[in-house]
Amino acid sequence: MDIFSFFSADFWQANSLCFMFISAFLSATVLPGNSEVIFVALAVPKLMLGSLFNVDILALILIATAGNSLGSLTTYGIGRWMPKFDPKNYRTLWAINQLRRYGAIALLLSWLPVVGDLFCAIAGWLRLNFVTSSLFIFLGKMVRYVALLFLSTPFLL
């Protein structure tokens, strides 16, 4: 494989789900990933070919959700390693209070920019149950990508 095949359209098309996973994973961490842009760019051509829920669309949703969820669980794991401290930042105090009040169900909002990453890290720091935290993170991320899919369909009509 030569270096120029990396720039070909065939290479990107053949590996689109892999790139979606990587972008979704990075988007859920503090690194930039632009998963929404890539998701819509991959979903729109598939939507133009057929129905709203075909195998390609479902695979795209599952891959994006899995990558984004694993990125958030990485942030959760980093939160578990953080030593106990007395937070003084208003945003951190607010997130801690919300997670103490609502528990792991608050992680349904883990898809939100900035606050979602903070929720995941604090959930790990508070030692919330890993299985229930994973479930709510996964559900929140999936709802986000399904909503993004429905928001992008009016532009096809």
UniProtKB/Swiss-Prot annotation:
How does this protein lie in the membrane? Multi-pass membrane protein
Keyword hit for Cell wall biogenesis/degradation? no
Lineage: superkingdom: Bacteria
Major location (coarse): membrane
The subcellular localization recorded is: Cell membrane
Q: Does the keyword Transport feature in the UniProt annotation?
A: no
Keywords carried by this UniProt record: Cell membrane, Membrane, Transmembrane, Transmembrane helix
- Matching InterPro entries: DedA_domain, VTT_dom
Q: Which GO terms describe its cellular component?
A: plasma membrane
Membrane-crossing ranges are 3-23, 24-44, 47-67, 105-125
| Similarity comment: family membership | To E.coli YqaA.
Q: What is this protein called?
A: Uncharacterized protein HI_0489
